[in-house]
From Swiss-Prot:
CDD domains: BamD. Part of the Bam complex. Keywords: Cell outer membrane, Membrane, Signal. This is Putative outer membrane protein assembly factor BamD. The keyword Membrane applies.
């Protein structure tokens, strides 16, 4: 009985201590919320956007002690602080968060613009992956549809132009890479994409020349691919003679069938490349005349036919 009483007394004392400390703890958290919020505002007004961003982030750790209007203001100024500090990755993150929570607010239009501009600035140079560039274009078009009379319209149109130029050079560099490393068919496909989608950024005359030239060099790639596939087929046939189980035999036979299909596919690619090169060369002559590029392409065509 005495032991039970002591245990209950200890538990009761613990609860009293917790309850006594709770108001102090909450008061401390409320103090932190106020401190970081006010520091953030002060730093933002002074133009110290990195410090402002840091303080606003800390203030959100105690958001239960901020009013709804203060939370909205913190989230809005977080977007602007990150953007003005050229921390475009965080600007994208905070802009998306703000738009998700306050899509109809008066600040949403500006935040949406910041999101678009930050996406294109996050996007790397044309040599690397352009996922962010594609997303920037998508968001920019969404912005123009949503805010047709926006004060940011001109800037968003400039973002689209900048993003399209990045995509154009990205495609061009891929084509050039394939061309330089001996994959003319792949290069031709990429040059065609540039011709169709981004002709305004390059000399169409030279692009058309490169497209046709790589079509005419396709037999070199086809020969290399065919030889490689034939080696694989020979290896598979040798292995087929060694295996015993029906399952293994079936698997190897299927592999041989697939490889033989690939040989036929490459031969068809060569045929189609020749036909397209003939058509494209005729169009080239009609548009650009019998210039130096045309004469070089004509020699390649005659070499293929011989």
């Amino acid at each position: 009985m005495g032991r039970t009483f002591r245990l209950l007394s200890a538990l009761l004392l613990g609860l009293l201590l917790i309850n006594a400390c709770a108001p102090k703890s909450e008061a401390r958290r409320a103090g932190y919320a106020k401190e970081f919020y006010e520091k953030g505002l002060s730093e933002y007004r002074k133009g110290d956007y990195g410090d402002a961003k840091s303080n606003f982030e800390k203030a959100l750790n105690y958001l239960e002690h901020l009013t709804p209007e203060q939370i909205k203001k913190v989230k809005y100024l977080l977007v602007k602080s990150a953007y003005k500090d050229k921390d475009y990755v965080d600007a994208v993150v905070y802009a998306e968060d703000f738009l998700a929570n306050y899509p109809g607010s008066k600040e949403a239009e500006e935040v949406f613009y910041i999101l678009v501009d930050s996406l294109v600035k996050v996007a790397p140079d044309p040599y690397r992956d352009q996922t962010y560039t594609v997303e920037a274009i998508r968001k920019a078009k969404e912005f123009l549809a949503k805010y047709p009379d926006s004060r940011f319209t001109r800037k968003v149109e400039e973002v689209i132009e900048e993003a399209n130029k990045k995509l154009a050079y990205h495609e061009y560099y891929i084509a050039k890479f394939y061309e330089e490393y001996g994959y003319p068919y792949n290069a031709a496909i990429r040059y065609r994409e540039v011709l169709i989608n981004f002709p305004e950024y390059f000399s169409e005359e030279r692009l058309a020349y490169k497209y046709i030239k790589n079509l005419l060099l396709t037999p070199k790639q086809v020969k290399r691919e065919r030889e490689k596939l034939e080696d694989f087929i020979e290896e598979a046939k040798e292995k087929l003679e060694e295996v015993k189980s029906p399952e293994e035999k079936k698997a190897i036979e299927n592999r041989i069938k697939f490889l033989e299909g690939e040989v036929k596919r490459w031969e068809k690619i060569k045929e189609e490349a020749f036909k397209e090169a003939e058509r494209a060369l005729q169009r080239y002559r009609e548009v650009y005349g019998e210039n130096a590029y045309y004469k070089e392409l004509l020699k390649l065509m005659k070499k293929w036919k011989s």
